[in-house]
Design a protein with these regions (language model features):
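Secretory targeting signals
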Residues: 2-14, 34, 38, 42-88, ...
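A short amphipathic helical element positioned immediately N-terminal to and/or at the very start
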Residues: 17-29
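Generic structural signal for small/hydrophobic residues in well-ordered secondary structure
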Residues: 24, 109-111, 182, 188, ...
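Helix-capping/transition residues at the boundaries of transmembrane alpha-helices
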Residues: 27, 94, 105-107, 179, ...
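Residues that define the loop-to-transmembrane-helix transition and helix capping
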Residues: 35, 113, 190-191
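Transmembrane helix boundary and interhelical loop/hinge segments in multi-pass membrane proteins
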Residues: 86-108, 112-113, 120
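Transmembrane helix segments
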Residues: 189-224
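Short cytosolic juxtamembrane segments of multi-pass membrane proteins
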Residues: 265-269
């Protein structure tokens, strides 16, 4: 008697992506540099916020207290933690090229774009959780050290404050994705990190050498200037509005990731 086997349920692309994502999460969790990099980001963010909360009130007049964007000040550690998030984004992909483990990864997952998509998803979720949590902790630490009745004291319910705090976490996440995209393009840790830092800081320095009218036109669209609009509560002249500015910053990350997805299928491992 012939036995007809029941047809196997189709293995969907979503299920495959979920399996690969679990594998990438396991790899991210078992690498020590992940914990040290994220710890450095959180500590620098919160510690600097607490330090500013202690030192600023005694160095500012009451009039300055009332006009300063204290929410942005409380997130001043972002300039340090952003480097850690960017470096981690780079290492998510370049560390495998450096050790040669990328060959084993691609042998297990021949669909290269699927592999890169899984890395992107896992990193984005991890960075978003840690980024928002660290920025919220930084804001609360800053507020905790301000004297009662100080003009810089704010609440998360005040207009724009919650958006700025959560937006800071979004900024760190997108910056890390920019690093991941550059890592996929360059495939060298040192080269990708140098390119990322150059892209963040060098254009702003060069723009400062231009005539003021040119600065006002160009500077708002530079990566870091555009991205940091999301963490401002008080809009400043010659800068983009928070969400449009953040959208411009996202375009930089999207361009890097798109190039990475294209190149990863056109080059040998």
């Amino acid at each position: 008697m012939t036995v007809i086997a029941a047809p196997r349920a189709p293995y969907s692309a979503i299920a495959h992506l979920a399996d690969v994502s679990r594998s990438e999460l396991w790899k991210l969790r078992t690498v020590r540099s992940t914990y040290w990099t994220l710890l450095a980001a959180v500590v620098s963010n919160v510690a600097l916020a607490a330090l500013l909360g202690i030192l600023l009130p005694s160095n500012l007049s009451a009039r300055q207290d009332a006009t300063i964007d204290s929410t942005r000040v409380s997130l001043g550690g972002l300039h340090l933690s952003q480097v850690a998030f960017g470096v981690l984004g780079v290492l998510v992909i370049t560390s495998e090229y450096g050790t040669g483990m990328i060959r084993a990864t691609l042998a297990a997952v021949p669909q290269r774009r699927l592999m890169l998509a899984a890395k992107t998803i896992v990193f984005a979720v991890t960075a978003l959780i840690v980024g928002i949590a660290s920025c919220l902790a930084a804001y609360l630490a800053f507020q905790a050290f301000l004297p009662a009745g100080d003009g810089m004291r704010t609440s998360l319910s005040d207009p724009g404050v919650l958006r700025a705090v959560t937006g800071a976490g979004l900024y760190l996440t997108v910056l890390g994705l920019l690093g991941l995209g550059l890592g996929a393009i360059i495939r060298s840790s040192a080269g990708a990190i140098a390119t990322l830092l150059g892209l963040l800081f060098v254009p702003s320095l060069l723009a400062a050498l231009l005539p003021q009218s040119w600065q006002d036109t160009i500077a708002p669209y530079l990566p870091m200037n555009a991205g940091e609009t999301i963490i401002t509560v008080h809009h400043q002249a010659h800068t983009l509005q928070p969400w449009p500015g953040f959208g411009v910053f996202c375009l930089y990350a999207a361009a890097a990731l798109t190039a990475g997805f294209i190149l990863i299928t056109r080059r040998d491992a």
